């Protein structure tokens, strides 16, 4: 359509419009040069450029990335899924309007809640728990080794029917263990998480953001926001995946750092050496 319109116009007009376009591009590039010049001057004047990211004001309440969703394909096709083996996400909020309409149209009897096994809402008061919420006498001293043994134990459990206070404590365990990884390991943690859960690359951004924000969480505020804003099923999926992958990855990416720290371990305390986060990988520490 455009080509035939071009052909019908006089050559001069066509030429003029192209020239005009070129002129426009040149104008942009010259303004870019000016910008670069100004940037160089300001940089050389101060020699220090503070990253703008530190000037962002904290937004309250905290916004949490959406939980990674792996929606059941049967549900997406508009059929109710009644397989007891299906481990996919069966939440209706995850469906598009069209998929939801299909589902409603096909549904003839029975209660949706019953068939979709919708989990009970969690106790939101546990977002910022106190020590009293975890009724317990004085327990063992918490060392890194204790954390690893605890994570190994819970990685083997089915936590779908677990009580809320324990689930909340498991979220804290994940947060604490995330912070034992070096920052450079977080993208590997994210990739391994996606692979284990069979999630697409479109979920990489929210998963990575959760790990990054747990890693830099001050005072547990992001952890509390996660508990309040994610549903129980999403929390269970995330925690289960993390506990299973965290123990397989070395907690420090740099072999140089690890070998350097190894030289500092006192000879008499070799049995205790594994309480140092940098001495070896999670998996090494986990084996008796």
Curated annotation (Swiss-Prot):
Residues 1-44, 121-140, 268-288 are annotated as: Disordered. It comes from Zaire ebolavirus (strain Mayinga-76). Residues 26-40 are annotated as: RNA-binding. A zinc finger (C3H1-type) spans 72-90. Gene3D superfamilies: 1.20.120.1160. Belongs to the filoviridae transcriptional activator VP30 family. GO terms for molecular function: identical protein binding; single-stranded RNA binding; zinc ion binding. Residues 100-104 are annotated as: Oligomerization. Changing residue 230 to F: Complete loss of interaction with nucleoprotein/NP. It comes from the Viruses. Changing residue 100 to A: Complete loss of homo-oligomerization. Multifunctional protein that acts as a viral transcriptional activator. Promotes read-through of an RNA hairpin in the NP open reading frame to enhance viral transcription. Mechanistically, nonphosphorylated VP30 hexamers form a ternary complex with the viral leader RNA. Clamps the RNA template and the complex VP35-polymerase L together, thereby increasing the polymerase affinity for the RNA template to increase transcription initiation despite the presence of RNA secondary structures. Also assists stop-start transcription at gene junctions to promote transcription of downstream genes. GO terms for cellular component: host cell cytoplasm; ribonucleoprotein complex; viral nucleocapsid. This is Transcriptional activator VP30. The gene is VP30. Residues 202-237 are annotated as: Interaction with the nucleoprotein. It is found in: Virion; Host cytoplasm. The modification Phosphoserine is found at residue 29. Homohexamer; hexamerization is essential for RNA binding. Interacts with the nucleoprotein/NP; this interaction plays both essential and inhibitory roles in viral RNA synthesis. Interacts with VP35. Interacts with host STAU1. Interacts (via C-terminus) with host RBBP6 isoform 1. Interacts with host DICER1; this interaction prevents TARBP2/TRBP binding to DICER1 and thus allows the virus to counteract host RNA silencing.
